[in-house]
């Protein structure tokens, strides 16, 4: 870079102050700045980089071009005329040209301001005092290297500066940014130092060492201007220069002050990070030092919070203060002041002990708000106060620590201290005892505490008032003393076994005895100096000996670490045995914990692992000696035998040895287990485990599936966790070759994060032993936990998680540490742990009423990962909660069915273990805790159903089968909660499976025909049909039918009273059937039996010829010849081979299908699409016999808890007959709010597009004068009901454009602010389809238009106000609306009236009567849908004329003019249309479905076997009672609404072949069972697989110029619940399917003929309306046809015999149909059933039949 620059400027031959710097800067040895200059960074890489980045252009080169340099003459350079500095203040020639400096001071060399060109300085003469610059780049520097010095010159005069003139000096770099100015000033100061100007640089007090000369001032001014361009100067520098542009010294002084301040901050931070305190200096001084540093940093803008400050202080504590690290590290809200109180207390106690004064220290663990007790996990804190004189110390209780202290030091084999030793013995480590001194531990000490910090010694404690010892072999005259109360430093009780004498035999052959207490619950044996002083023995820490008052030396003292010790060899042994001493005093407080209890508490781990863990303090709160290990050797846990049964062990030592060289958390093993079958959908089926190679730390995560995105989420989570929590980076992950690990997505993720995947070789499972062994261990534990607790299987992952928590805390036999210890974490506090499945009572924070019991029975699972609470399973609520508000249940009963656990009752042990935690709960109860039983992230396990048999038992107790009164309800407080056992009842879920979680897939028994006989009187039939409840509790309905029996009884298990039905046979003659009708009371009519009516007697009509074409009167507009062939011609009917017609007797036709369950729905009878969607109400009122099951709340059986509390989840009885209409199906929300689109949108590109759309919308609103901009109203002045909330919504349209819309919240608009009679009309879909069909047949041009901001063209009459848009920032103001804003109730109606008036008055159109939004004139037809217009015309110019007229008033955009003769593609109201005039039209939604369906989160199977049909015949939806908790129910209903909403949209647009399935599933929106959801998923899957299908139309070629409108009708008799029939109609115009309808008959039909009549009567009104529309749009004659495959229906329509109408209802229906057919000139024709395409609208069909009926018109 430098060579390039110099080559551009050959005139720089002798060097220049502007030359590019390519080497490190050279420094002198003087530093007048004292602090700041010494801290200035070396000018090395930064300066080189700054210069190397300069370009070679004249504008930015490090050596700016100077055209005047070639011949620098005084007259040739004009003075500067502009610049940042004032022209009148420029230096005079005399000032800039001092004597003796002619070349540098020449006026031509004064830099032009504002630095229009940089001056090129010629080298001064040899007499000059200023330095010369290198003549070439390659010239070596004769100055010292940068490493040789980094200080400034400290001269007192200018003469001294000139005594060490350097030959060559490198200039500073050019300043390129204001942010770089602080670093640049440092290099500039070094430049001045190297130029022998160090004496003029201001010192720390702001004054230079010497006075600056005029020549030096000129040099300073010019060089500063050269290398610091004005545009790059900071603001404060510019402010100084604006006052005095030559005051460079002030700038330097200010810069040095800032550098000094920065240096002080750095020093403070370093000091704070390296604090050290051990009590050698006063605590006040230490506190003052620390607080001054923190205050200084805070004042300089560096905020040090309490948490960070306390951590830094605690890290520097040592000696007796070190323990504060461990007692304080969990206190989250600790302050510096509180920490220093503890430090002061220890210091004062230390000083007081040394001065023989009473001492006291506040216990640092006594926090007011601390609800837990934390165990010190390090060596003792307060037991080693060793003053030189302790004779006058006050007696205090012993302050010792439990054995839970950590110890990682090796043991000592012996200790040896010379008898003549009088000098202090200082031991730096335990091995220093091997000093050649022969004093081994006495053999009488049979208790070898090899884990002691100094084995075989007593710890001298000045703070202990009593002597305590763990070994029973040194206690003489032991006796029981239960009244002694001893506490440790944390004020915790120390259980005492016995009291006795401790006898010493010192080296002067004297014997002494003191009192001693025996306890195994301390870390070290303590020798109280107070008790020694009582027998005239003192400790001299000057000579390190124990001595009497006369100076007699008794024993040496050993100093090890911070403490002083005396050997146990001076103790005399006793003859008492350990069992004797342990039995001297037995109480509840000293009783050891039984091993079976600890075994179960610690997740059924083996005894060896538990002992290692207790021995190494990885499990805290108690030690190894607190456990009774006598039964551990031969103890067999029955649950372990069952849960951990195995064949053989894994092969060990199979992984590579090089993995051991990795650091913690750099090498992970992972594996996936699953699936676990027969679980609820909400429970995880898999889990993925991770194991760290070094620490063996384990993680487990639940999975519901093994999809790529699920696995990727887990990997992302664990990598972030390790990075943030352990500051480590994962380098390698070992895994098997499963597809979930080898997929491309995960491989890219690992590659992006720099992680090496290590896969096992094929069929080499041994190489993956770490992960596989972990999974096996966890599964063994899981099975054992579930077996032991009796909890349902869907909680299996909670057992896995509990086991993981415990396993991470258990020590490894090899490393003797736990995974938590290896990871640097504290040990597991077992006092916070409960056995898995422990029965508890949880406080109900939100009871149903004030008198409702406050306790909810539950089972403890595992500690919470997110709080200090516990995860508890509540069977009655079917969910888990995270809470601390619980009480442990106690009981003495047997805990297992198979095993006798009477001898293993651990209630007392559990109470002792959780005593501290109990006090915490009690305090919370007193303070009225606000714990809200937060639902944990384990609620995925809460979906579990009671076994049907269990619920039947509950019902049998709650409801009397003979009592007619409602059952009484017993609340929980009617019975006292009995003592419970640890095991949950087996009835919860003994064999959980999908069959008893979801409604049974077994179909109920079908109605049986007891006798079908043909009688001589006309074929009398006897049909006994059982009364079936709308919802059955059991899987099967019991019914017995005798061939001759006429009595039938059915009991409804859901009714409050038993109903007996007696079937009364009804016989009739003359062609009728005998049937049985139940005698029911008026209250039972809703449960009546609906029997089949006799079929219509068609015997008389059979003799007559049955015409296929009904002769009717014709009008003049109808052709005279209407034959069946002309009606059926050109219809898209299937091609069938000719078959002879097969006539079936009507009586046989009317028999009910044998496999049709009359109360079940199939995808042949799932019922109506009508379904309520309102789910907010807690109680839904359904019609007919809907019942809410009210079960007694008798809970917790006194015998082994054989029944759970009846669940609070609402039982929803499946009753399709109660559903009347689809109120609304919630659409899929495709819009975004303002905060989603802009405020919190992380996609920058998308955010910018939404911002542009936002401003575009605002501009359009202002352009349309939407509101009054002349005045803003105060909110208090306006009636609140006239104020409408407003909001912005954003969405991305299908064409990729981003749109914003400002809308009003019309959903909360007050009714007084609009006219409810006004309607917002849009074009009916049938009208659009009719117009498109006519356009194809008549070669019409189709033009698509869009009117921008259509609603804003309509004025608003009402006085309404809205809040201004957010960008105006006037939240407290209102503006008055002038236009119909989107969202207002009246906006749609206002726009409709506005555009309607304009089309009629200005465009000459008229609206078709009966069809809103369809306008026509002689040439053009317009279909209007809000702001979208579709124009149809045979002449394109007619369309253009309409467009021109519209553009005069509205902002009209032409979406598609439609002028091409080739295929044109449209997107009209969601339909994707391909149209070629005169040939064909194809209607589909492929692109839309491809975009929308994946957003539904439906598990699609793109590569699997495609469904050939949306459903299969014979598949029935079970109507078992569905019981879900409210949130789960609402979630599933909402999911059903989304799925069915999309399916309905597609079906009614063009996929008429799916309408039956859509309608059927829509009836079950409020019954979202697993079966219903699975069927819905299959329907969506079928739509996805066939998303490319299209409705195909071809141009018709009629023989005569007529339009032919046909409806094909069909009905499926009695195939819906409660014997309702399904009816379907398909409408065709000129052979093209334009619409379809499938629905359940609103009335119950009594025969097939009646069902067909009902179907036809439903189709006629729409057929007539369509006929009117076709005649209005196209003046051709029209032929209307009605096709059915029911000959009996045709016979009734054409017959004049009224005797065929057996009752008034049927007669009126048939007569009306006769009138409609004759009055509307309908041609009724017969069509074969195999060709009846309407059959797909009424029932599920086999795949072959379904394809045959649909492949002609949709493919």
Swiss-Prot record:
Its main location: cytoplasm. Its EC number is 3.4.23.-, 2.7.7.49, 2.7.7.7, 3.1.26.4. CDD domains: RNase_HI_RT_Ty1. Residues 153-165, 402-418, 960-969 have a biased composition (Low complexity). GO terms for cellular component: cytoplasm; nucleus. Residues 583-640 are annotated as: Integrase-type zinc finger-like. Mg(2+) 2 binds at residues 1346, 1427-1428. Residues 1338-1476 form the Reverse transcriptase Ty1/copia-type domain. The active site is at 461 (for protease activity). It comes from Saccharomyces cerevisiae (strain ATCC 204508 / S288c) (Baker's yeast). Residues 1610-1752 form the RNase H Ty1/copia-type domain. The gene is TY1B-ER2. Mg(2+) 1 binds at residues 671, 736. One of its GO terms (molecular function) is RNA-DNA hybrid ribonuclease activity. InterPro entries: Aspartic_peptidase_AS, DNA/RNA_pol_sf, Integrase_cat-core, Retrotran_Ty1/copia-like, RNaseH-like_sf, RNaseH_sf, RVT_2, TYA. This is Transposon Ty1-ER2 Gag-Pol polyprotein. Retrotransposons are mobile genetic entities that are able to replicate via an RNA intermediate and a reverse transcription step. In contrast to retroviruses, retrotransposons are non-infectious, lack an envelope and remain intracellular. Ty1 retrotransposons belong to the copia elements (pseudoviridae).
